[in-house]
Amino acid sequence: MKADMPLANGLQALPSNDPHMAMRRVRRLHFVGIGGAGMGGIAEVLHNMGYTISGSDQAANGMTRRLQDLGVRVACGHAAAHIEGADAVVTSSAISATNPEVAAAHAQRVPVVPRAEMLAELMRFRYGVAVAGTHGKTTTTSLIASLLAEGGLDPTFVIGGRLNSTASHAKLGQSRYLVAEADESDASFLFLQPMLAVVTNIDADHLPTYGGDLGRLRATFREFLHHLPFYGLVVACLDDPGVAELLPSIKRPVLTYGLQETADVRASNLRYSGTRAQFQVTMPDRAPVQVDLNLPGAHNVRNALAAIAVAAELEVPSPAIQRGLQQFAGIERRFRAQDITIAAGRITWVDDYGHHPTEIAATVQAARDAWPGRRLVVAFQPHRYTRTRDLFEDFTQVLTAIDLLVLLEVYAAGEAVITGATGRDLARAMRMRGVEPIFVPALADCPGLLRHVLRAQDVLLTLGAGSIGSLARTLPTTLSPEAGSC
């Protein structure tokens, strides 16, 4: 770690912008699985605070390359030698206890710190804004960070997606504000103790973490919200049934948002124009504000309302809120739309991370609102066999509302195959409903098939949280008129 001055006990002082005097014994932090969005973002912030950061991952990706460009030492593969000299080892829930670096840390009595606990340490001496919810966390966190920055508050942020305006997942700001996602997938958000918490929605997902019990999931959200101090603030989406059901039991101040007339922060006069949404916002103690949001869909209007509520609470002026929403540059793989030319003519291609039935339905509706009357072609890769099993009927229902579906095999994300929960099983269930999807077992075959089925003026959606995201780098080329048939 960079030192401002030596200490009498031989330790070094922390950098002047680091309030964590209790961490003065920590100079070097090693991240196992540093290529993950959440891990890499925290590593980048700590690197910029002056800590010596190293890390490892199974394979290089955009995150590892960015960190290497910043001067972080990143190893490909895992080996016990990588932790030599580390004062603590940071891991994500995806890393097994049998990982050689984790095992070596335990053997050497080096603290092994969960990712969320390290995020909690970053938040401990700051004004923490934590965004929780099954859907919309990344977009809402990005919007909040953008509005605070537009208002001159210069926040630190850690986001699960790459913010296009900064080309990064994270930034070390100079103010006391820290904005971050709160991850319910492994219940690790219980490490956090923010000053302000947003809850976008509570839906059935990651149920294996909660023993398959939706009630237990909701109870864990309640526990998270009670980690706020009694003078903190919960910003909650009144439109979501899961959140609305929880509100009577929340013993903290609450500010609601949504499209309902009873919401504290409410959108009205909503209309769509291409990939933008226009609406008026009414909120306590401010004049109504007219908003031109550079995002499509009612779900993004709600995400924007959450960000507006937080920005208003932190006294960002209304003109800055309007500018921030109008100029918002979006996030990688969140409704990223572009027109491309294929052999049949021009089409619109939207790439999106959505992989839950609720997210798919919202993205499909946003596309229909943006380009009414055009044929909608969706290439969807289900993510995890457990999710496909738990939400099988919901997937079947939402996917039947698409004009033409290209269905890929499930992206396992390390899970074993579950009988009855494969992509082929989904395709079979849809055929029983009278819908004929095109099943493609291998992702590599998808571009070639799309060349044959796409027509001029189609809207193509590529959806999923797995390897389908790699199409974003190659699809315009593989679908171009100059490309050969696959």
Regions found by a protein language model. Name each.
Residues M1-M118, L233, P241, R266, ...:
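N-terminal leader/targeting and accessory segments in enzymes
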Residues L14, P19-H30, G38, V45-M49, ...:
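Nucleotide phosphate-binding/pyrophosphate-handling subdomain across enzymes
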Residues R28-F31, V89, V129, P155, ...:
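Conserved hydrophobic helix-helix packing surfaces used for dimerization/oligomerization
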Residues V45-N48, Q68, H82, S93-L238, ...:
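Phosphate-binding loop of NTP-binding sites
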Residues Y51-Q58, V234-L238, V377-F380, A401-A412:
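Short internal beta-strands
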Residues S56-D57, A75-H78, V113-A120, V158-G161, ...:
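Beta-strand->loop->alpha-helix junctions that form or flank phosphate-binding loops
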Residues E101-V110, H226-G232, K251-P253, A362-W371, ...:
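P-loop/Walker A phosphate-binding loop and immediately adjacent motor/lid segment at beta-alpha junctions
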Residues R266, T396-A456:
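C-terminal helical cap/extension that packs against the catalytic core
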